[in-house]
Amino acid sequence: MIDTTLPLTDIHRHLDGNIRPQTILELGRQYNISLPAQSLETLIPHVQVIANEPDLVSFLTKLDWGVKVLASLDACRRVAFENIEDAARHGLHYVELRFSPGYMAMAHQLPVAGVVEAVIDGVREGCRTFGVQAKLIGIMSRTFGEAACQQELEAFLAHRDQITALDLAGDELGFPGSLFLSHFNRARDAGWHITVHAGEAAGPESIWQAIRELGAERIGHGVKAIEDRALMDFLAEQQIGIESCLTSNIQTSSVAELAAHPLKTFLEHGIRASINTDDPGVQGVDIIHEYTVAAPAAGLSREQIRQAQINGLEMAFLSAEEKRALREKVAAK
């Protein structure tokens, strides 16, 4: 189902949601951190989704053990490097990794700006080693409130040339986008792209707000757009992309089952929607699974899957020249 003549991308992938269970175990031992289990087999149920979670917030707790072992900046550097290694192993040519430095720093009171620098270093080294192209998206974790998001924003701005876009993630229902207008004004002033998690837990109004008030060029998840025909028309007309994450939306109970996922309808409506993983380490899936298992189960035809793959590159926060070069590089192989 993957067209090997086209670039394979993953543009909605959380770096801090892709910490290997084996790495959690090793870092726990290295830093003498008490874990809920001492073997890989018994740890996995604590750090991966085994059964669908009742809601988004419950799903997000599965990420916590991964960041609890980030006891040093070296540990942050390691998981960033391993994220690129994982991307290469699964055949990705281009990946946009998003991360919340405040969340990564929290358990051990690491310097937030230091976490940003460590992630940049690890990703850069990974790209050099494995030949994957990557860009970084800074996440503000809305769950921790406006002041914490301000701290994350300042840390990103200290490395503004290494950050491609700003995102807002976390508890969408409890912390609406309207709380973060000034943060996104500064992000746009910095020349960054904007993508926002919206319409995953909250309704279509959250997506409208992300676009109109925060300046979103892409929407993370966006499943609730299916409830608003005018919104779907607007997304298609304005070419505002939807970063679909099929398996994730089932695991968070945002969508009841793959057969009911709106991605097929979005594509039929002319919306620029792509296939992505979200938190592959926590989900126990990879991009190959999303294309070859999840997408067909969601009712996508072979041609629709190919279109979603094309959309992944079209939606990417790359220049037209960078996209052309990547297409040519893959086609020449």
From Swiss-Prot:
* Any one annotated GO CC term: cytosol
Q: Which cofactor does it need?
A: Zn(2+)
Please write the reaction equations for the catalytic activity of this protein: adenosine + H2O + H(+) = inosine + NH4(+); 2'-deoxyadenosine + H2O + H(+) = 2'-deoxyinosine + NH4(+)
Establish whether keyword Metal-binding is in the entry: yes
GO terms (molecular function) for this protein are: 2'-deoxyadenosine deaminase activity; adenosine deaminase activity; zinc ion binding
**Protein family per UniProt:** Belongs to the metallo-dependent hydrolases superfamily. Adenosine and AMP deaminases family. Adenosine deaminase subfamily.
HAMAP family registered for this protein in UniProt: A_deaminase
Q: What does this protein do?
A: Catalyzes the hydrolytic deamination of adenosine and 2-deoxyadenosine.
| Name of protein | Adenosine deaminase
Species of origin reads Escherichia coli (strain SE11)
